[in-house]
């Protein structure tokens, strides 16, 4: 996975976690395990990087954010490397609007 694809995967996971939090659904650990069980192509380093991004967003925000993208954009304000992954590439998230 490219860094941008890892960011997109974290956004997708955060969206699922946010929905589950609002509806009293499964825990984040369970959702992460299910997500990667369906995506066997992701290697251990990819899974670790995505998981770390997801938990960093959860720890940093406290409150339930509007979306996974909003959560990672909040992290990207302090992390230039993360902000650079919002490049609009084929498997990455849409670019950050100025």
Model regions: which residues?
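Class I Rossmann-like S-adenosyl-L-methionine
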Residues: 1-98
